Amino acid sequence: MSTVRAPLLLHGAAGIGLWDALRQRAADALCESPDASGRACGHCAACRLLSAGTHPDRFALLPEALAVDLGEAEPAERGASPPSRDISIDAVRRLVAWSHATSHRGRARVALVYPVDAMAAPAANALLKTLEEPPPSLYFYMGTHRLDHVLPTLRSRALLQAMGRPEAAAALAALRQRDCADPEAVAAWCRNAVHAAQPEAGLDWALDMLAWLDGQGARQALVAAAPPPAVAVVALQKITVDAMRARHGLAPLYLPRHAARLRRLAAAVEPMDWLQRWQRLARAAAETHVALHAGLSAERWVLEFDHIHLPSEV
Ligand SMILES: [Zn+2]
């Protein structure tokens, strides 16, 4: 078992399996018969309690909505107020109270906090003292996909560790296991971040968009079929990045099978125009992260691309 006592803050892109990695670390720390490399055995009493979700020495601090999505909490009753997307100060206080109890099984105790950027300043402040001086044998494993959104006071108390994207082979295997129809295309589209809820989100629409820009299909159909704004904006950003790459003679990252089409589009617009479009999309993506209704409509963005649109004779 690790002797590092500083709270660990694991960070990396969304969809790379960060929550699974935190859960695995908790399992490794709590297992009562780990293997030689320190991995949880999966069948001791502690591992069985963990898989039943009833281990008393593990505490998961998550936003309510995420806890339900990740199977860490039961969905709220019908008619209850919608689950929160933030980690509340009350939830932090419950963790702090729990942290002072003694271990039920006489071993390590683990607090998981994910994502730490879901704590507003008051909630984070309520956690600082416990992070600074955790009770004996308490481990903090925290995670974030947005390290730049983590409060400096919290960040400075943690040991930062970056988590990379899955390797291509592992990403393809994970997609095949989920019966993905076109694992290669999806792995490229999400750049191997296959543990996202929907790694393929926006791909079909992006292909329609690309076809329309290349003179096939109708704009109205594209607008009507647009995914939610947050997905649409990211899809358009990916097309833009690939077009900018094509302009510089580089292979596409997200749409590797469509290099020829991307090269035709890339040539239709000045490089600076592509860059400015990308910047507008990045700003819109930051807004939609906070509020999905951030005044963004697919129509506005499709129009934004309208003058790139190649005539159908091409
Ligand atoms: Zn075990």
Where are these regions (language model features)?
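Charged, glycine-rich active-site and insertion segments that engage polyanionic ligands
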Residues: 1-38, 46-49, 100, 136-139, ...
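Clamp-loader machinery-focused feature within the broader ASCE/P-loop NTPase space
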Residues: 1-122
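Structural recognition of the conserved hydrophobic beta-strand(s) that form the central parallel beta-sheet
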Residues: 111-114, 127, 138-144
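Residues immediately C-terminal
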Residues: 118-119, 133, 149
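Short N-terminal helix/helix-N-cap motif within the alpha/beta-hydrolase-1
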Residues: 121-124, 310
